[in-house]
């Protein structure tokens, strides 16, 4: 009987992190080092459960949770040159930097109270989600851990040679950097 109650779909909550804006504040050297925020990522957490419904969120599009992950150890760094069509080449037009293998963490973000939880998404159960989750929670009360994170960056090998059309040239070649 206890197992049926514990494993009931009424007790399960699915939480999905959703982006709600464009990442900002990218710092290349922070991505290659340690203990400095690499970028700012605005997100919200979408909670789903038969009782709280499908419109329950922690954070909103207008007031998101802002994550600022930072490397906890120095990542391994590698560079790969390739042509505009993606073929590896020592003298290619593009270079892709990979910073991999470091754990990343953020303990600085605040988390607002829940919204839209309950029947019809009207928020009748916001209080219950907040009570169970300890929300709202100030900066320093939350943590995000990313194990063996990877950060990638692609750029023109010699941006000066494409001047004054670096942006146009990069936009023609960017697809070759994707793997």
Model-derived regions, located:
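Extracytosolic secretory-pathway proteins
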Residues: 1-179
């Amino acid at each position: 009987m206890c197992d049926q109650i514990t494993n009931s779909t009424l007790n399960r909550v699915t939480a999905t992190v959703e982006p709600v804006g464009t990442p900002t504040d990218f710092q290349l050297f922070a991505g290659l080092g340690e203990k400095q925020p690499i970028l700012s990522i605005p997100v919200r957490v979408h909670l789903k459960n038969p009782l709280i419904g499908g419109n329950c969120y922690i954070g909103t599009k207008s007031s998101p949770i802002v994550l600022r992950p930072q490397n906890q150890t120095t990542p391994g760094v590698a560079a790969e040159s390739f042509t505009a069509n993606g073929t590896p080449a020592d003298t290619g037009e593009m270079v892709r930097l990979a910073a991999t293998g470091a754990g990343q963490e953020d303990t600085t973000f605040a988390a607002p109270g829940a919204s839209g939880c309950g029947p019809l998404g009207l928020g009748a159960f916001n209080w219950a989600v907040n009570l169970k989750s300890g929300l709202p929670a100030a900066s320093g009360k939350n943590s995000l851990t990313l194990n063996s994170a990877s950060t990638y960056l692609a750029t023109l090998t010699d941006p000066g040679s494409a001047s004054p059309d670096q942006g146009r040239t990069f936009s023609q070649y960017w697809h070759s950097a994707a793997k």
